[in-house]
Amino acid sequence: MWYHKLLHQQSRLQNLMKRGDIAHGLRLSGFKSLFPFSLHWCHTASKSVNCTWHQHEDHLELQYASTVMRFDYVWLRDHCRSASCYNSKTHQRSLDTASVDLCIKPKTIRLDESTLFFTWPDGHVTRYDLDWLVKNSYEGQKQEVIQPRVLWNAKLYQDAQLPSVDFQGFLETKEGLKKFLQNFLLYGIAFVENVPPTQEHTEKLARRVSLIRETIYGRMWYFTSDFSRGDTAYTKLALDRHTDTTYFQEPCGIQVFHCLKHEGTGGRTLLVDGFYAAQQVLQRAPEEFDLLSQVPLKHEYIENVGQCHNHMIGVGPILNIYPWNKELYLIRYNNYDRAVINTVPYDVVRRWYAAHRTLTTELRRPENELWVKLKPGKVLFIDNWRVLHGRESFTGYRQLCGCYLTRDDVLNTARILGLHA
């Protein structure tokens, strides 16, 4: 299961971090060295004697080393990387998939060292490196974690002693940006210090890593407790843990917070790793985890304040997983904005409430709560698909600014810097 892989990965990462060698670990072939199954496939190219196959009516059964894989013949023809089928400069397919005979079979198959050659009925030859087939097979993907993460509760995060990144280093050096993104990808939160306490500098910081996602709240939002928008965030009240924009079909990926001024008490920010809590549910009540990943819910935002009139609806389960490896990639949890439950029959509703209660209990455990006092100059980035946030009530005048970032662009920046994202 995905959490077993993450637990193993987390242990390896923590050992690397203790030795001050995390950057080395992150560079190793996109984290492959951190996974036991990736190690299994290393240096197998020379072991061609361990490669055998059997041709079935509609697919090839291939055993390479100790792994059995199955490839549909249409798939093998469609994924040909020859010059006439695939443009290696643009990394785009040239072959018209609809032109491939759905009953196609190779005339011959031969192995030359670590490469399989397929000759098709029309004479076209497709070649595949065995390691490429392993990496891209369904059986191989079932063992892969899409994004390595370190799951945490408050103590685990504090014990990691992750350093913040300085504003100038973040803006001016690849090393500073990469260090920030390493922390963010692994833990779902990251801080930048010594930022001038203005909206303009906060925007400059955000644009270093991503395009800013414009929403119904604008590009950069700036708010106090004046209830200028129809949202509890625009008050002095405490906010329970939640993820933002659950009422969007695609919730915003990253959230940026900068407290520009606070003349009063309270107002600490609450952070909870939703994936850590979900892991506890999966371990203790796997059937409830499954239910939370299967039942679609509506979340809704209705606003009629001043000139702001909006009615947003987003639909999706609380826990979102990749179907091929059951890896969790998004948690959509906001009890404020959850709409009427009318997407499942009555006999599922009670079981859903029980599962929701189990997850909520985990999210509310005091040991899972990380409390942070935001202050001018300290900017917080939150993975809104993973980490829930909230706040305690406060007194006095408090100004915050921030924005949402497009998740694709943050991950794109990370990949360009050589990180696994």
From Swiss-Prot:
Binds 1 Fe(2+) ion per subunit. Its EC number is 1.14.11.8. Disulfide bonds: none annotated. Its cofactor is Fe(2+); L-ascorbate. SUPFAM superfamilies: Clavaminate synthase-like. The modification N6-acetyllysine is found at K179, K236. The keyword Mitochondrion applies. Fe cation binds at H242, D244, H389. It holds the Pfam family GBBH-like_N. Residues 1-15 form a transit peptide. One of its GO terms (molecular function) is iron ion binding. It comes from the Eukaryota. It is an enzyme of class 1 (oxidoreductase). Keywords: Acetylation, Carnitine biosynthesis, Dioxygenase, Iron, Metal-binding, Mitochondrion, Oxidoreductase, Transit peptide. CDD domains: CAS_like. It is found in: Mitochondrion matrix. GO terms for cellular component: mitochondrial matrix; mitochondrion. Pathway: Amine and polyamine biosynthesis; carnitine biosynthesis. It catalyses: N(6),N(6),N(6)-trimethyl-L-lysine + 2-oxoglutarate + O2 = (3S)-3-hydroxy-N(6),N(6),N(6)-trimethyl-L-lysine + succinate + CO2. One of its GO terms (biological process) is carnitine biosynthetic process. Its main location: mitochondrion. Homodimer. Converts trimethyllysine (TML) into hydroxytrimethyllysine (HTML). Belongs to the gamma-BBH/TMLD family. This is Trimethyllysine dioxygenase, mitochondrial. The gene is Tmlhe.
